[in-house]
Amino acid sequence: MKTNIKLWTMGLMTAALLGNTACTDLLHDSYGQVVSEDYVPKTEEDVSYLVNAAYIPWRETLLQWNGVVRAQELCADQDVLPARDGIGWVDGYIYKRWHQHTWTTEDDGVLQGWERTYNGVNTCNRILSQIEEGVISVDGETKEKLIAELKVLRASYYYILIDLYGNVPIVTDFKDTSLPQQSTRKEVFDFIVKEITENMDLLSETPRGYYYGRFNKWAAHTLLAKMYLNAEVWSGTAQWQKCIDECDIVINYAEKSGEYALENNQKDVFVTHNENSKEIIFALPFDEIYVTGWNDFDFHMYTLAPENQDTYQLTARPWGGVCAVPQFINSFDEDDARLEDNYIQGQQYTYSGEILKRSIDGKPLIYTVDVPSIDQSDVDDGFRWGKFEYATGITNRLSNDWPLLRYADVLMMKAESLMRLGKSGAGALVTQVRERAFKNEPEKAQVTDAELMGGSVYDYGRRDSYKTEHDGGTDIKYGRFLDELSWEFCQEGRRRQDMIRFGIFTTKAWFSHDKSDETKNLYPIPNK
């Protein structure tokens, strides 16, 4: 995305905002500086530059090295980062520990989700403090709306923290330097819900323009729906009807205004220039030129084999790591377009159409579904991530915007809540999402309420070169619905959360992962 990138680069508050420091490089922590007393936002554009400084940590916590996407995906049943012959990816066995649920408080993946997300909380608190003290001179309705947006944004960072760590400290006072006390998970849940509900009606209803990549009213309702969707796990009390109510608010607005809708092709949500997608409710804007952190959105770098540099004419050579768990790939219907659209597979070619060959032995580079184990794999074992478009000639960073909240999720959240309440209508909503994936076989898009309540088609059980088990998934309550979530939302940094909600994250085995214990439903709070 390029047309709106100024929302992020200018969000750093460069010379106009920083007292003694000015920098346009997003590698800098310039959003951590105190805003100059001379700065007075006068226009809607000025306000957008101010508030967007607080959104930058979302990108970092989600997608930078060992960020939240990995913390949600590499521990779950869809993706694995195995050791690669001739390439590496052993890295002190951090990815093996992720896969096998044996992580420690010292692991980088445990630490980064904590530090980067609290950086987002602290940035919100800093700007709120400056507004409340008059350092940033904002008056009247503009001040009220700005404070509301920052509080909802802060709540979104706590949405990550409650999911990953549970009973975390609630920090709202930027100037309080005392050691914060942990809150219970329910207290954190109630805080997040309160912050969203008390402030969302003050947010803009505008989905684009200066509000693209920011929380508007509809994004807040969607975030609140996700809180209610996970309420039973996070607070101890299910709130399915409240989830439905929040989804209905967004659905009714979408149908009335036409601002939000499913794309005709799922792939269109994830193309390089996806900033105009009506399916995206809340996006994290990216641009390979202006977003300059080395590991900002580098899916192509850590999934493609090094030889694929010649396929996409990349400016840097990929590292050939993450791939799909074979059991997950085998769960797809062969006519489901999402299997081909979301995974790079089969014979690989150069940009000019010649057969791409393996550097190690000159044989054709062919991505196969099978992977021997977490401990050993060849350069072309496993299907590769390909949901996001890899544009020709890109650098080590993608320019696709990240669809953090999208309309398909609203439909699926409502469907799941209806199903769990024993109400009708889930099948029709899921069918609506499936139809674009089965255009050539429309009858296969149809799914009923009863089918969604059945078991999973995923054949669980340890399945690698060390052991072969076939435990299946027919015993999973609402397992078919869980399958639907996996097929629609793969590679989007949410699988762990879904598996926990359906009660199988620690009770099932897959690939090189054995069953673990319920303590692994949360990451430990880091020691550092």
How should these model regions be labeled?
Residues 1-32:
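Bacterial Sec-dependent N-terminal signal peptides
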Residues 22-25, 44, 63, 67, ...:
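Long, intrinsically disordered, low-complexity segments
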Residues 24-90, 197-198, 214-365, 507-512:
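An aromatic- and glycine-enriched ligand-binding surface/loop that stacks and positions planar moieties
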Residues 39, 44-52, 56-62, 87-165, ...:
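Conserved, well-structured interaction surfaces
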Residues 90, 94-101, 329-407:
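Flexible, polar/acidic helix-loop-strand segments at domain edges
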Residues 160-164, 169, 230-236, 422:
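Short coil/turn linking the two alpha-helices of tandem helical-hairpin repeats
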